[in-house]
Amino acid sequence: MTTLRWDGDDLVDFADGPDRWRLDGTVDIPSIRRSFGLPFDRGLVSPSGRFQAVYAERGTKALLLQGGEIVRELTRDPYPCAADTIDYPIALGALSDGREVVVHCPDHPYVLQIDDAQTGQRLTDGPRDQPDVYQSRLSISPDGRRLMTAGERYGNDEVMIFDLDLAVRDASALDGDGIMPLDAYCTDVAAACWLDSDRVVIATTDHEPLFDDADALGPRQLGVWSVSQSRWLHRATVGYPMGTLIACGSRVITLYGHPQLLDPITGDVIAEWPDVPIGTTQGSYEDTNFPTPIAALHPDRTRLAIAEPDAITILTLPSP
């Protein structure tokens, strides 16, 4: 399977089939299987559920879908090395005015663009600069006001946050370093996610610090950053490596080696499942692709589904 989403208590792979798994172990596989004709291995769904996208994590092609039907083809610029080493940059979401959008890099791997999902209209027309950042791991805040990217610059994994309300009025707002100071952290970023519309959780690797600053997020730390206050609310040093982060209410799930449920304030491990092996991906840049784990959190935050090679594992999460 290549994509996974919850539909009630069923799990659906909307890129293949679509196939449907039920909690009683039965599987609905259509007699006539849908095929998009391209080797897509990842997918995402807009918060409203209205739009979906399927894409090749290390490729140049994607499809925007609505109700399983193709709306249009998307591409990313086949810039030398970018498609082979950087995860496909794409996010689906809604702006603060309710317009559903696609954020991606169709023209250049450094340049973020915002398109109306329904019409395809480019909302960020105009002259643009090309900052030396391979954009990747895009995510829109729940209120649609901000965009976070977790890409790569000169071999370092970085996080940047941009004002989307400003960007649709002045596209050049997406060309700088954003509204989060780059000296807020002093080492490579392993993963990041929105905790809510103001707070982001950032996990770092164990790489040596690039500079010394006691106020910066350092190696192997977990931090909660407030965008509105432009400061760290919490920082904790942890004794374990971290990978992909998934927000789960006031907690976060990290996927590295095996799933762990964390308290982002203290860094404490609330629960873990060492018998569920997953990859060891950190950041969005690798010469050799270590695929991002395929996982889906149930909307009620009580269950996490993880795709394994021959099965789907469903984890029951402890109550807050």
Per-region residue spans from a language model:
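Loop-centered beta-sheet repeat module
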Residues: R122-A173
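Blade-level signature of beta-propeller repeat domains, shared across WD40, Kelch, NHL, RCC1
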Residues: T292-P320
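Repeated scaffold domains used in trafficking and secretory/extracellular systems
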Residues: M1-R5, S35-S48, P80-G93, V133-S139, ...
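Short beta-strand elements that form the blades of beta-propeller/WD-repeat-like
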Residues: D9-R20, G49-E57, A62-L63, G98-P106, ...
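Asp-box/WD-like beta-propeller blade repeats and closely related beta-sheet repeat scaffolds
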Residues: I70-R99, H104-Y110, R122-Q135
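Short, conserved, GDST-rich strand-edge loop motifs in beta-rich repeat architectures
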Residues: E152-L164, A203-L217
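Surface-exposed loop/turn elements that mediate protein-protein interactions on large endomembrane-trafficking
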Residues: G17-F36, G59-A83, Q113-P127, I161-I179, ...
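Extended, helix-rich scaffolding/adaptor regions
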Residues: M1-G49, V54-Y55
